[in-house]
Amino acid sequence: LRRRQMIPFFRKLEPCLIGMEACGTSHHWGRELSDLGHQVKLMPPVYVKAYVKRGKTDAAGAEAICEAVTRPTMRFVAIKSPEQQSILALHRTRDLLIRQRTQLVNMIRAQLAEFGIVVAKGIQHALRLVGQLVEGAAPDIPALAVKVIVALAEQLSDLQVRIGHLDKELKAWSRDNATVKRLQTIPGIGIVTASALAA
């Protein structure tokens, strides 16, 4: 069954139980099929795997899903709304940018260490030192090396701005969310964790 054939196919069926592994696009299809009146249940793939009886094929996977969805002890995944998926996309993007920021800081520190300059840990220390390089604070570092390090620092500054924008979006979304507010009353749970749990 091709993707474009899914909705017409399920539209013709009487409402029934549909089991799917909770993976890429499953929440979208869960919403679409639920709108047609079907009962959709998403299951973590790791739990479905226990019901696979033979090699990994589409038929064996479908059989395992059919078996797993009828089990009374199966743990199901709630179908996420578009709003919940949006905030999860924000979290994933923020996480990616933070990892890239860490890589850039480490690269700047490593490049400077090659010239005998040790930078204290932290983004601000790296950016401050790069600013001093531009002003000529280390004349023995070749101009080409300074250009390369400055390019990394510019990218780092850009990432800082982007992460700041995502943090503002996260705060704005969380401000009106009762679940996030309730979760934040738990000691040690901040806005990032609370919004991720709420999504």
Which residues make up each language-model segment?
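A detector of single, family-specific signature residues
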Residues: 1-199
